Each structure stands twice: as structure tokens, then as C-alpha cells.
Regions:
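Conserved N-terminal structural module of periplasmic/extracytoplasmic solute-binding proteins
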Residues: 2-116, 427, 436-458
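Hinge/lid segment of periplasmic solute-binding proteins
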Residues: 107-162, 218, 305-307
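Extracytoplasmic/periplasmic substrate-binding proteins
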Residues: 112, 218-221, 250-344
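Short, solvent-exposed loop/beta-turn-alpha elements that line the ligand-binding surface or hinge
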Residues: 123-138, 182-184, 205-210, 228-248, ...
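Extracytoplasmic/periplasmic solute-binding protein
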Residues: 145-158, 163, 173, 187-238, ...
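Conserved C-terminal helix/tail region of periplasmic/extracytoplasmic solute-binding proteins
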Residues: 173, 179, 394-458
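Glycine-centered hinge/linker elements that transmit conformational signals in sensory
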Residues: 192-194, 234-266
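C-terminal lobe and pocket-closing loops
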Residues: 295-301, 314-319, 325-423
């Protein structure tokens, strides 16, 4: 499951089909060309923002033009197919060998792509990657075999997020709670949810998902927060049919039925929770920091009323994110050109995604604690943070509880075959939230059995 900003509708068009004619020279495929006359290189790069995201699209077009002006021997062909990584078609496209020269991936795709043999090992060009030593090692290792540094590298991370607790600062104040100190344990979430629900008027203290894959996603996040794992270390078996998995279900059952702090409307999905938060009727829910800007933009909720706290619990938090990998058909020149463009667009403070002054001038939100790809304390992290705060258009203080806890949180990636597993998890979450006395052990064991089948067939 992805953060709010990635939930775009699928578009059937294949962008810039006519650009294939540019590939007449050289040996590279996938819409780009290898080194042509006078050393000219053409590369096709995935995930150009769609036209519906006008500001982001404009920034991309500006950056491509600036990059090509600075590098006249490189032509960028942008692919705006969206979603950038459609789970329903990604594997088939990968198997066909028709990926872009520089193709977009979620973190959860990396292992499968490497195993498929469809991506190029770029380790020999690692010295050309800007600020590689300042990137969080755990993020870089996601693009290595086995997730550890072993002399190979198949991709470059560009952004990441970890889940936390989105909360309504205004309701906290009304309930006599400190809006600068959101709960940090599930026991505190439960206690605060009761106080917020007691305000009446249809206000819900805490809400959770249970439909369209979102329920299984949040079950995973809440399991991680308690120190649990969805799958065994080898990724072959379910690992949540235990006391930790049971604790997730019991906690929700108690808040829903004993405390009555989760409201009666259930089977919630995607935008339901941001909408409830935006209407001032919800106190807390698990979500990434970008939910705050989405709630403000979509539902006109004042930024002053919104905050982000850490994921409750001491176990950890769910990590998501994305990056780029390189087609196995790329020539060395295409790989190096691709790295140079990714450096420009995603890995240089003050440029591309880190051009906060431009974003501010365009009326875009600046100040979110994501992406957070740099190692804490590094000079790159410090300069990026300083520039972001200088250009902030949202109250960065409202994210301080999240930021202060982040260095001590263990971030865990989603399980393999995540979407299929999440769909089965919906049934468990729905049962707990719609039935007063379901058989929790039976629900958990059935979910584990279904997960084992998914992993075995993956």
C-alpha cells in the first residue's frame, strides 16, 4: 500500500510512443538509444508526473530542459504512464523486457526485479552517484541482492516515508490533551481516543481501515509497531500467528467494542479517514506525513489543526518508498546518463525535488518531513533540512513529535506479495471491527494460512 500521493487513477495511454523513432542509433532498447553519432545518448525515464499534477509536471519539464541544456549530448524521453508502477501489470511488463531505460519501482519491487534478471547491476558506476555516502544505507541496500551490501547495486532510492499517527490538534485541546504530546504507545492511544470520543457530536477518537487492501496494510503497520513481523526472515512463511498478532486484534476489539471510541461506521478505505479528519470528526489514525497536506488541500482543514506523531509502540514502523532501476538492455552510456539525471532530479540539495524555493513560489506545500533519504547528521541532511525550514509553507512544529522519534524507530519494509496479503488481512480487520465477539484466534490462523499460500505461489 502506498502513501496518499501515489493513489492516482490508472491511465491506459503509453506516453510518447512516437519517441521510439529516436532509438534508431545504437543498441539500447526500451525507447532510448545507445551512444549515437558524436556520443549522443537518449534514455527513456519513467514516472513523469501526470498532467493532472500541474505543478509537479511543470517542475519535471523545467528540470528536463535544464538538464538537457547542461548536458547537450543527452536526450531525456519522459514516460508519464500512471500509475508509475501498476501492480496489476508490472510483473508482466518486467518479464517482457520492455521496461524504460531508467524505470520506476517501489521498494517492495526491488527483490523481485533483481531476481528476474531484467535489471542492470550499476555497482561499477556507484562512484558517479551524487551523495551516495549520505544516503541512508538501509535504503540503498534495498536495491542489493539479499538487502545487504555485497558488491552489487541495482537501483537508487529517491524518496521514502514511514507511517506515524495523524491527529487533530484542535480535538486534543478540546479533550484536555496536550496537542504537542501525541500518544506514543497503544495504551495511550486507547486512553486518548476515549477522551476524544467523549466530546460527542459524532466525533470518533480513533479510526482504522478494513477494506480494499487498506485493512491488511494497517494490520501490518500495527504489528510492526509492536515488534512483530509479517513473514519469516526468508520470506517464505507467515510470522504473525502469535501473541503479537493477537495483541493487534485485541487492541482494536477493545477500542471498538469496550470503549466505543472507533465509531459505528466501519469498512473504511483509502480517503475515508482523511475525509473524517478534514471534517473535524476524527481524533487519530495511522498515516504518513503527506496525509496532512492532502487533508488541508482536499478538505480545507487548517494546518494549525493537524499534526503528525510517531507510530505508537516501541517496535518499529512501516517503511515505504520508491526509486529507480536500470534496464538490463541499457548500454554503459545509458546507465551513466541515467545516473546523471537522477543526480540532478533527486539527489542534489537545492535542485529537483529539493528545490524548495521553487515549490514555495508555486504555492506548493513545503515543510513535510519526507522524503527523508539522508543519513541523520550528515552535512547533506543538515543543508536540506535548513533549506526546507527556510522555505516552509506549513507549520513544521506540528511534525516535531514525529521527527523527534524517527531516529529511534526501526523502519521495516512491507512484506513480499504485499497487496495479495493485505487483501486477506482486510477480512480479519473487518471481522474485528464489525462483529462484537469474533473468534480472534481462528481469524489470525486463517489469515496466516492464506498468507502461506500466497508466499508459496509467489
Amino acid at each position: 500500500m502506498k502513501k496518499i500521493g501515489n493513489r492516482a487513477a490508472a491511465v491506459a495511454a503509453f506516453a510518447l510512443a512516437g519517441a521510439v523513432s529516436l532509438a534508431a542509433c545504437g543498441s539500447g532498447g526500451n525507447g532510448g538509444s545507445g551512444t549515437g553519432p558524436s556520443g549522443h545518448v537518449t534514455i527513456k525515464v519513467g514516472c513523469e508526473p501526470p498532467k493532472t499534477q500541474a505543478a509537479q509536471r511543470s517542475f519535471w519539464v523545467q528540470d528536463v530542459a535544464a538538464f538537457e541544456k547542461a548536458n547537450p549530448n543527452i536526450t531525456i524521453v519522459s514516460d508519464d504512464t500512471n500509475p508509475c508502477d501498476d501492480p496489476t501489470t508490472f510483473n508482466a511488463k518486467l518479464a517482457s523486457g520492455k521496461m524504460d531505460n531508467v524505470f520506476y519501482t517501489y521498494f517492495t519491487d526491488a527483490t523481485n526485479v533483481i531476481s528476474s534478471g531484467q535489471s542492470a547491476d550499476i555497482q561499477k558506476y556507484a562512484s558517479q552517484i551524487a551523495n551516495l555516502g549520505s544516503l541512508q544505507p538501509d535504503l540503498v541496500n534495498l536495491y542489493r541482492q539479499g538487502g545487504t551490501s555485497g558488491g552489487d547495486l541495482y537501483g537508487i532510492p529517491k524518496s521514502n516515508y514511514t507511517l506515524g499517527l495523524v491527529y487533530n490538534r484542535s480535538l486534543f485541546q478540546r479533550a484536555g490533551l496536550n496537542p504537542d504530546q501525541p500518544p506514543t504507545t497503544w495504551a495511550e492511544v486507547r486512553a486518548d481516543a476515549k477522551k476524544i470520543s467523549a466530546l460527542g457530536g459524532g466525533i470518533v477518537g480513533y479510526a482504522d481501515y478494513s477494506a480494499v487492501g487498506t485493512g491488511g496494510w494497517h494490520f501490518t503497520a500495527e504489528l510492526y509497531s509492536l515488534g512483530g513481523s509479517m513473514v519469516t526472515s526468508d520470506g517464505k512463511k507467515a510470522a504473525f500467528d502469535n501473541s503479537t498478532g493477537m495483541q493487534v486484534l485485541q487492541n482494536l476489539q477493545q477500542m471498538r467494542w469496550t470503549d466505543n471510541s472507533m465509531g459505528s461506521k466501519q469498512l473504511l478505505q483509502y480517503n475515508d479517514l482523511p475525509q473524517m479528519m478534514g471534517s473535524g470528526k476524527l481524533g487519530m489514525y495511522v498515516g504518513a506525513p503527506d496525509n496532512v497536506t492532502f487533508i488541508h488541500q482536499q478538505y480545507r482543514a487548517p494546518y494549525a489543526n493537524l499534526g503528525e506523531g510517531p507510530m505508537p509502540g516501541t517496535g518499529g514502523t512501516l517503511l515505504g518508498g520508491d526509486g529507480y532501476m536500470f534496464s538490463k538492455n541499457d548500454t554503459p552510456a545509458q546507465i551513466q546518463a541515467g545516473i546523471k539525471f537522477l543526480n540532478f532530479e533527486f539527489l542534489t540539495p537545492g535542485a529537483g525535488q529539493f528545490n524548495f524555493a521553487r515549490a514555495k513560489a508555486a504555492g506548493q506545500p513545503v515543510g513535510l518531513p519526507q522524503p527523508n533519504i539522508w543519513t541523520a547528521g550528515s552535512s547533506v541532511a543538515q543543508s536540506t533540512t535548513s533549506d526546507k525550514e527556510k522555505n516552509a509553507t506549513i507549520p513544521v512544529a506540528n511534525f516535531q513529535p514525529y521527527l523527534q522519534a524517527a531516529p529511534n524507530m526501526t523502519a521495516k519494509i512491507e512484506p513480499p506479495q504485499a497487496q495479495a496479503i493485505y487483501a486477506q488481512g482486510d477480512r480479519v480487520m473487518a471481522a474485528v471491527l464489525t462483529q462484537r465477539n469474533p473468534n480472534l484466534q481462528q481469524l489470525l490462523s486463517t489469515f496466516a494460512s492464506q498468507t502461506n499460500t500466497i508466499l508459496a505461489n509467489g
